[in-house]
């Protein structure tokens, strides 16, 4: 009887593990989808982040993903500008919302030839790769590059928003 009970427990644990892991994989795949539904708020977040980074003098090119000190110093990284815009538009920060994901996708597209370098640099610092921070901190990233990924993300969200209205 106890052997049967152990097998049943083992099978139950195995099934639950598959369900949980499968759910996380599906969730991650949905987050990384490039055709998520967009809203006017997504567009406003991108526009606000772009406005916050009005010129190179307010850009912090050494992001650590801690934004309070950036705000106090009057400079923002790409990540911190998006975080501030997110909070202003949504009332809270949502790490994986569509607006931020679109910027991540624009970064992936702009840095296809440097993806390996970004991952290696992150691993050397014993951290997981963070596309927004890693792109911001690449030595060859210029302020114009930051503005360009915001522009690309804004155009993509705007185009999808217009298509959804038709």
Label the predicted regions:
Residues 11-17, 115:
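Generic short amphipathic/hydrophobic targeting helices enriched at N-termini
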Residues 16-33:
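Bacterial Sec-dependent signal peptides at the C-terminal "C-region" and cleavage site
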Residues 46-106:
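Short N-proximal segments of mature Sec-exported proteins
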Residues 87-166:
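Compact alpha-helical subdomains of small soluble proteins
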């Amino acid at each position: 009887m106890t052997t049967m009970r152990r097998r049943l427990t083992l099978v139950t644990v195995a099934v639950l593990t598959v369900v949980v892991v499968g759910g996380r994989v599906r969730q991650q795949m949905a987050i990384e989808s490039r055709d998520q539904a967009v809203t006017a708020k997504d567009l406003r977040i991108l526009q606000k982040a772009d406005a916050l980074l009005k010129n190179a003098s307010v850009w912090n090119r050494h992001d650590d993903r801690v934004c309070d000190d950036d705000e106090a110093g009057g400079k923002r990284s790409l990540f911190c500008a998006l975080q501030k815009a997110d909070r202003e538009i949504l009332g809270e920060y949502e790490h994986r919302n569509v607006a931020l994901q679109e910027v991540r996708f624009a970064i992936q597209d702009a840095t296809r030839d440097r993806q390996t370098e970004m991952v290696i640099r992150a691993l050397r610092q014993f951290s997981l790769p963070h596309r927004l921070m890693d792109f911001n901190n690449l030595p060859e990233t210029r302020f114009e590059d930051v503005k360009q990924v915001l522009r690309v993300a804004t155009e993509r969200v705007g185009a999808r928003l217009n298509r959804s209205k038709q």
